[in-house]
Amino acid sequence: MLKDLFKKSKYATVNPSAYKSKVVEEKPNIPSGMWTKCSNCNSMIYYEDLENNKYVCTKCNQHFRISPKERIKQIFDKDTFKEMWKSLKTNNPIDFEDYEEKINKSQSNTGSKEAVVTGVGRINDLEVACAIMDSFFMMGSMGTVVGEKITRIVEYATENNLPILIFTASGGARMQEGIFSLMQMAKISAALARHDEKGLLYITILTDPTTGGVTASFAMEGDIILSEPNTLVGFAGRRVIENTINETLPESFQKSEFLLEKGFIDSIVERKNMRAYLYKILILHGVNKYE
């Protein structure tokens, strides 16, 4: 009896490594790319739901950045968009170090030669010329080829009496091309002035982000200026301005809603309504059906 009082209890032992391996084995196998995170509300969104909602957050209505290919799919009649000057590609006019590598990387990532797609297409059978900037290609920065392609499509619209739509999405002039990139601001604006002299319609649609030299030139020259919700629109960065004027800017500063309030843009249009809204504007301005 006394022996039993001082007898050690028997304990079961667990092998931690065996338990750990079992837990690993039981983890669900979730394929990558099924979910994505909203940059605005941090919600996790099922990618298929996002795609079906035109890449707009189903929780907070944040408009995700989209490629020109997706934009064409959403705006134009099926199989009517014809891309023009697709083969134009950038050289290195000022021999900027590593510039070719950055271009090659962007081309590989996006499948595009440059940061803008230009061409003609139809919206409910109304023919328009169009330029769509690509924020995924070096942040949509404007170099010589971007400037040349936009100028050419504006000139094509002028010669063929077509309205022109430009979807802007850019970080501004491309620093790797120096003064040559800045020259594109005046070049595009001059082409748009000739388009305007013929009494033709020019609509700009500001998408996130629209900044720098693009904002300072053709983005704000439209006869009608539209924007997607919560779009960043500005010239210099917020911190640069605050440090220059030594003041704290409003939270909504450089957002499309702020610009609408101050009269810089005409309307904020949600992506799901953009095609119908553009069609109404084109009809009101007497754009004829495609023949």
UniProtKB/Swiss-Prot annotation:
GO molecular function: acetyl-CoA carboxylase activity; ATP binding; carboxyl- or carbamoyltransferase activity; zinc ion binding
Cofactor: Zn(2+)
Single Gene Ontology BP annotation: fatty acid biosynthetic process
Chemical reaction(s) catalysed: N(6)-carboxybiotinyl-L-lysyl-[protein] + acetyl-CoA = N(6)-biotinyl-L-lysyl-[protein] + malonyl-CoA
Zinc finger annotations (C4-type) as residue ranges: 38-60
Assigned EC number: 2.1.3.15
Annotated CoA carboxyltransferase N-terminal domain residues: 34-291
Role this protein plays: Component of the acetyl coenzyme A carboxylase (ACC) complex. Biotin carboxylase (BC) catalyzes the carboxylation of biotin on its carrier protein (BCCP) and then the CO(2) group is transferred by the transcarboxylase to acetyl-CoA to form malonyl-CoA.
Subunit structure and binding partners: Acetyl-CoA carboxylase is a heterohexamer composed of biotin carboxyl carrier protein (AccB), biotin carboxylase (AccC) and two subunits each of ACCase subunit alpha (AccA) and ACCase subunit beta (AccD).
Name of the featured protein: Acetyl-coenzyme A carboxylase carboxyl transferase subunit beta
Species of origin: Clostridium botulinum (strain Alaska E43 / Type E3)
